[in-house]
Design a protein with these regions (language model features):
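Alpha-helical, hydrophobic structural elements that either
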Residues: 2-231
Length: 231
């Protein structure tokens, strides 16, 4: 994937030319745009910008172009990361707030070239989650992944909500690279609830929280009444 040369990272460019790279070129339509997941690669010491050469990272390249052929320029497209779109990995069976580009110490480089926008996603290695379905999601605007944008089915499958403009790709990771212990340690280290919740479970939780708020408000009201009586 030659666009990685734009990042001034010869090591990463070489990694994308190696046998370890997976070239995908999968395409989806998002509003007025055509989005292509070009490819991905995982490994240690494959980018000169990674301070720890022993740390394994995952990189993925996504391109965006207007479906009608109009070239993207700085005047008609916000190419900065999390400008027009947010790009993030997600993992089935995990709360989207716990496993995403932000919690995975990730970053996304972006630039315009020949009328297209390119995004290069860089995160901690996703291979530890490969015994689950691992997604790459792209959605409009800037916001951290949440249940407002994503829903989870009973089997842990993650999907965009109907009112969210975006798309999701499945990353073809080798299941033999999975490390459930490392995955568990990671999600617990975030301090964020990581067990998935369906819409039905979220509704029950919300109802319980509303009830607790009502009880708390009633308690304050009763205390005020007793104070007034005492006076």
């Amino acid at each position: 994937i030659r666009v990685t040369v734009e990042l001034n990272d010869p090591m990463l460019a070489e990694a994308f030319q190696s046998e370890a790279a997976v070239i995908l070129n999968e395409t989806q339509t998002v509003g007025d745009y055509t989005v292509t997941l070009m490819g991905m690669v995982s490994g240690a010491n494959i980018s000169q910008w990674c301070a720890d050469v022993q740390e394994s990272r995952t990189y993925a390249v996504v391109s965006v172009v207007r479906t009608d052929g109009t070239p993207l320029t700085e005047e008609n497209y916000d190419v900065v990361p999390c400008g027009a779109f947010t790009v993030t990995p997600l993992v089935s069976g995990y709360d989207p707030r716990a496993v995403n580009v932000f919690t995975l110490n990730g970053a996304c480089s972006s630039f315009l070239r020949d009328g297209r926008a390119y995004y290069v996603l860089d995160t901690q290695s996703l291979e530890i989650f490969s015994d689950h379905t691992v997604y790459l999601a792209l959605y409009e605007g800037f916001a951290a992944p949440s249940y407002e944008r994503f829903s989870l089915a009973e089997d842990g499958t993650v999907d965009l909500r109907d009112n969210v403009t975006g798309c999701m790709f499945t990353l073809p990771l080798d299941t033999h690279t999975a490390d459930p212990d490392a995955a568990r340690a990671f999600v617990e280290s975030t301090g964020i609830p990581w067990e998935p919740m369906t819409d039905a479970q979220l509704a029950v939780q919300e109802a319980h929280e509303d009830l607790e708020v009502e009880k708390s408000a009633d308690g304050v009201g009763n205390q005020t009444f007793l104070i007034q009586e005492a006076n």
